[in-house]
């Protein structure tokens, strides 16, 4: 399921985040890439262990915790701490597939995170740069994504994807991965659509007895499928 989620960051959060990132020291993004990705990757990345990266990551995680749409669509069990990248001067990231497992070392260990869902949070206004589209090979064809600052897109971690060259301006984004309670994308899509329908029915016909039944179906399916 490829899903744009608008306004994950408030204007105040976005301004605070950009202020921190604009003052940061960036490194060559290939340092953190795997063998396959390093051959396709040309960007700058904020070192994961820098104080600014940790502060910015915490801000993004706090914003995600307040997004009911994100929770409903991703059903997160674990979230890899958000990372940050920057593209300018023709930089790009060729077609690649994300590693199936990432190791979260933010708490001193090496906790595995299965990358069921990939996510990109756009931090630059689309009018401020040319190119930089996130191109995703989806089951429904090729999708090109370039969202307003503060908007998020999530998509299956199995997807082949790339970032087009940025030919003017600078594209800054956060990217991260989610280990979902449901590793199967079709099951996540089904439960998301069911949850959206329940929410709409609750608004249109509050108190309808069928809502209790539908809510029960949702939770029973989640109980059957969830890996917790």
UniProtKB/Swiss-Prot annotation:
Q: Which residues form a coiled coil?
A: none
SMART domains, per the entry: P4Hc
Check the record and name the Gene3D superfamilies matching this protein: q2cbj1_9rhob like domain, Rabenosyn, Rab binding domain
Record's keyword terms, sorted: Dioxygenase, Iron, Metal-binding, Oxidoreductase, Vitamin C
Write out the residues that bind Fe cation: 96, 98, 161
Per the UniProt entry, the Enzyme Commission number(s) are 1.14.11.-
**InterPro entries documented for this protein:** Oxoglu/Fe-dep_dioxygenase_dom, PKHD_C, PKHD_hydroxylase, Pro_4_hyd_alph, Pro_4_hyd_alph_FE2OG_OXY
Pfam family for this entry, one = 2OG-FeII_Oxy_3
The protein's superkingdom reads Bacteria
Q: Which PROSITE patterns match?
A: FE2OG_OXY
Which positions are annotated as binding 2-oxoglutarate?
171
Question: What residues does the Fe2OG dioxygenase domain cover?
Answer: 78-180
One example GO MF annotation: iron ion binding
Free-text cofactor note = Binds 1 Fe(2+) ion per subunit.
A single BP term in Gene Ontology: DNA damage response
Query: What does this protein need as cofactor?
Result: Fe(2+); L-ascorbate
HAMAP family annotated for this entry? Hydroxyl_YbiX
Protein's recorded name: PKHD-type hydroxylase xcc-b100_1388
């Amino acid at each position: 399921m490829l899903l744009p989620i608008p306004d994950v960051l408030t204007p105040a959060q976005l301004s605070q985040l950009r202020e921190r990132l604009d003052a940061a020291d960036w490194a060559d993004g290939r340092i953190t890439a795997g063998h396959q990705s390093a051959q396709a990757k040309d960007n700058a990345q904020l070192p994961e262990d820098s104080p600014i990266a940790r502060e910015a990551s915490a801000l993004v995680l706090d914003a995600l915790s307040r997004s009911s749409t994100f929770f409903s669509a991703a059903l997160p069990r674990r979230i890899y701490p958000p990372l940050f990248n920057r593209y300018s001067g023709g930089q790009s990231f060729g077609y690649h597939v994300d590693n199936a497992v990432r190791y979260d070392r933010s708490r001193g260990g090496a906790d595995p995170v299965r990358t069921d869902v990939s996510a990109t949070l756009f931090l630059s206004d689309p009018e401020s740069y040319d190119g930089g589209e996130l191109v995703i090979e989806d089951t429904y064809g090729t999708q090109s994504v370039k969202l307003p600052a503060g908007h998020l897109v999530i998509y299956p971690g199995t997807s082949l994807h790339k970032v087009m060259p940025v030919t003017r301006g600078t594209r800054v984004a956060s990217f991260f991965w989610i280990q979902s309670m449901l590793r199967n994308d079709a099951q996540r899509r089904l439960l998301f659509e069911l949850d959206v329908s329940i929410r709409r029915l609750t608004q249109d016909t509050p108190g309808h007895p069928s809502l209790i039944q539908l809510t029960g179906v949702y939770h029973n399916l989640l109980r059957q499928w969830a890996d917790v």
